[in-house]
Amino acid sequence: MFERFTEKAIKVIMLAQEEARRLGHNFVGTEQILLGLVGEGTGIAAQVLKSMNVNLKDARVEVEKIIGRGSGFVAVEIPFTPRAKRVLELSLEEARQLGHNYIGTEHLLMGLVREGEGVAARVLENLAVDVSSIRAEVIQMLGENAEANVSGSNTTQARSKTPTLEEFGSNLTQMAMEGGLDPVVGRQKEIERVIQILGRRTKNNPVLIGEPGVGKTAIAEGLAQRIANRDVPSILEDKLVITLDVGLLVAGTKYRGEFEERLKRIMDEIKSADNVILVIDEVHTLIGAGAAEGAIDAANLLKPALARGELQCIGATTLEEYRKHIEKDPALERRFQPVVVGEPSVEETIEILFGLRDRYEKHHQLTMSDGALAAAAKYANQYISDRFLPDKAIDLIDEAGSRVRLLNSQLPPAARELDKELRAVLKTKDEAIRAQKYETAEQYRAREMEIKAQIAAIAQSKKNEPDLNLEDPVVTEDDIAEIVAAWTGIPVTKLTKSESEKLMHMEETLHGRIIGQDEAVVAVSRAIRRARVGLKNPNRPIASFIFSGPTGVGKTELTKALASYFFGSEASMIRLDMSEYMERHTVSKLIGSPPGYVGYSEGGYLTEAVRKKPYTVILFDEIEKAHPDIFNLLLQILEDGRLTDAKGRTIDFKNTLLIMTSNIGSKVIEKGGGSLGFELSEDQTESQYTRVRSLVNEELKQYFRPEFLNRLDEIIVFRQLTKDEVREIAELMLNEVFARIKQQDIQLNVTERFKQRLVEEGYNPSYGARPLRRAVMRLLEDSLAEEVLSGKIKAGDSAVVDVTNEGEVTVLLGEKLELLT
């Protein structure tokens, strides 16, 4: 029997079982079916009972009065009582009498009334419902002739010409008349073209093709609104625009032929009604829909009607799905006339947002400023690259509205505590009722009313506070910027005072980690400041540099310091060691493997990393080690801030800082100084640096192509480290060692003699600071490791590292420190 039940009727039975569980009964009687009919809320039975002033709360009270609560033990499968089974049989009989091949909520209600002797009938009687009028009311709502049916006649007169279509679709024209659709702004050209195609004699089926989120479905809604406003040619007047849900059409078709029968019925209804325009969103889902075990799919069933003009259909799909599914079937493709829906411009998007403003203000109960709407379109276009206008801009104002409303509607802490207490009181009261302790329940009810009154008083006092603005909260440009920053990680918000201070003193902060190299630190700091203030070119990366110079002078270290200071941590930097890209085929690792090769689905290392983190530093370390083809790939990144990956997606590099390090020219630097290794006057040092820089630039020109070098913002040649700078770096390295050994609860220090020895051994102008690191390892870390392992230094000790007169490194414990003085 249940296979004939509609979805709503099945929901009623499920709700009836839930009601039985709630009351602790191990059976489903007529009274539970009645509660299910009222609780379902949307069916004809619920509407009839609602019109007779029957609500779920009162019905539950009456049922509980008559049958009370059960033991509380309820089986998983709850059986029907004999009377309830009789109601189900009578509902089947009622459906047959009305000529229906399904059992709906209305038939269950008529069966319930016809049975007439169960608890349900007593409940309705107690609620002062005229039981005798229920059947007539149901039949009237069904659109039947009451007299003919009361006498048992099988003649039916359907209220609607298209019942199946209404079951599996939504009437957009009716929704437009009721004001249920969002206004459609612009798109007049596309709507006119759709009307033009619909006016054809045959093949009058437009298909809207465009990227996701450009407003394809909105065009169908715009047509429905124009029909509702009678702003269409006479050929389209009184037409119904109905959107078909293909998923719902396929759902529940258990047996072969059921799907075809549904679709055939819909086509027959459309043909006989002769005033229906069918809208199928995601029209590519027709291909293969319902085609199980050799059955014909929906597309093949629709083809004849589409070609002959019997069926006016508006399809909507994306460019990719159209190419993948519909273009592969030329017979289906020729029946549809494509209408390309392009992405609107920023100005058009702002107009669309102004048109939608009222709907979103009403929903969120606030006001949206003009600046916020303009900012939403501008920021969405500039910073959110993998989606399309106007959808991404609408999402921004929607989420900003939600955020502002939530921030303005938070309860005071006192009210939150009371709310928590109220929930506990309600729970205890319910438990007391179940245990039939009515006196205790009454006490808890009194407490419940008291708490509710207190919460209401707090809410009222909050409203009456004079310092609060009684007007609706306003969504501003800053709120939109906050949402963009949360989505993308790109700071779009206005600069705060603390952030301005941070940017102004950026050089000093970076110099805490990078000794010397003023030119590089200043160039990087300027680029970051330009970008954050919003003065950089919006179509190029923040900046692009080549750091060239001898090894070990801080090229990579500066990039790490920048990532750590400004982007959160060193891990936030995208680092590509170009020595891994020496072969030609490794280019594909950056942008993804081509189709047909292993790893195609995974995407490229570079492109995927930037998609996830669009605001970051990208370090191409040791750039000269890479294969020359890599440089060709970098050309469009440097110039236009974009790169297309193997899947054809455009990746946005406009908010990245590109740094390439190179050792080209290190030999020139080593030889070019002439008197290197000797102390030079400041003028001599500067003239020597200028000469070295020009020599390095010449060598770079020999190695890289001119079009590559010409696209870079700056080529920075790092200086060789002086002895004083090496001494400062030694201090930094020693502090790192002190911090590491402090974790083992050992206090460490070194003497000036040891520092001097460290600098002497670690200073080599040709190799930068790396020999110093080796010297720290050899002279300090090795000595300490031996002392710790031998047990001479233990947790809680203090130690000093010194150098003896013979030049040997020695570690002295705390009690021997006076020997140093």
Curated annotation (Swiss-Prot):
Family annotation (InterPro entries): AAA+_ATPase, ATPase_AAA_core, Clp_ATPase_C, Clp_N_dom_sf, Clp_R_dom, ClpA/B, ClpA/B_CS1, ClpA/B_CS2
Compartment(s) where it occurs, according to its Swiss-Prot or TrEMBL record: Plastid, Chloroplast
Annotated ATP binding sites: 210-217, 549-556
Region of interest (Repeat 1), residue spans: 5-70
UniProt-annotated stretches for the region Repeat 2: 80-144
Coiled-coil positions: none
SUPFAM superfamilies registered for this protein in UniProt: Double Clp-N motif, P-loop containing nucleoside triphosphate hydrolases
Pfam families: AAA, AAA_2, AAA_lid_9, Clp_N, ClpB_D2-small
Molecular function as annotated in GO: ATP binding; ATP hydrolysis activity
PROSITE patterns found in the cross-reference section: CLP_R, CLPAB_1, CLPAB_2, UVR
BP-aspect Gene Ontology terms: cellular response to heat
Residue ranges constituting the Clp R domain according to the UniProt record: 2-144
GO cellular component assignments: chloroplast
Keywords assigned: ATP-binding, Chaperone, Chloroplast, Nucleotide-binding, Plastid, Repeat
Entry similarity comment: Belongs to the ClpA/ClpB family.
Name of the molecule in the record: ATP-dependent Clp protease ATP-binding subunit ClpA homolog
